[in-house]
């Protein structure tokens, strides 16, 4: 066993470039956190999960912390480090397809009414000692609908629940599936907001082919990138591309003011430094202006205009974006 352990240490040494003595010191130091008066945390970045052995990495982290008693204690646990603070905001502020603000579930097609939606997603507990905080799920859902539609949301119209878009049951709307559907021609338009899927996607070549099947694309970013200019990529004939691309220059993080959330679930307010250059605008102002113009168009009517026409859009302060 000792020879095998030493051999494994040699392999780690050759792979990581870390001397064996230093590795031993790290292992021994962290193992000492498995004591009543100590705690240790494991902090990792996206590489651990996105690695080819990502599942094993995560399971191993959890097992190590459980064995050392480092779960459920102050200073313990397994904690992710974000490269960009508002990556955490993507979950806190419902930028992912499967959740809405407050971590409420995205309505499914089978949730035909607000009552059916609440019945589906409100957890039930027979344990008399269970706090079951989510038993008030219906209150959260009504509160969210009122924030969406304001005075237009009332008990008589199910608080506007029928105006919400619904996802098909059992269908995946995550990143890989989204671009696969785009590749199949299921999308007319695409907002590439603060991203560059022509380079960052798992199959960048397929993503670029998918862009060519769009009628239009809006690229919101600091600078033009490979996604916005996919039509002049290697081996592409621009004359054969039907996609109309619009570029909206956005302000950098230091050029705008606002709040962020991080992995520790605390919020931080960040003040503006330099003013945005040229005609670039903060993301929020771009969204605000788009919303104003789209609402103005839907006030004239159109197919299923009610959700947009009745949308509460009162984010201006003294007539200006704040």
Model region roles, listed by residue range:
Residues 8, 35-44, 153-159, 187, ...:
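Short acidic (Asp/Glu) and glycine-rich catalytic loops that position anionic groups and cofactors
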Residues 15, 44-52, 83-85, 195-199:
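Conserved short loop/turn motifs at secondary-structure junctions
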Residues 16, 20, 27-35, 62-75, ...:
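Structural signal for hydrophobic packing residues in well-ordered secondary-structure cores
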Residues 25-41, 176-188:
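Glycine-rich phosphate/diphosphate-binding loops that line cofactor/substrate pockets in enzymes
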Residues 66-244, 249-257:
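Extended redox/cofactor-interaction regions of prokaryotic respiratory oxidoreductases
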Residues 258-259, 264-322:
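Long, C-terminal catalytic modules of enzymes
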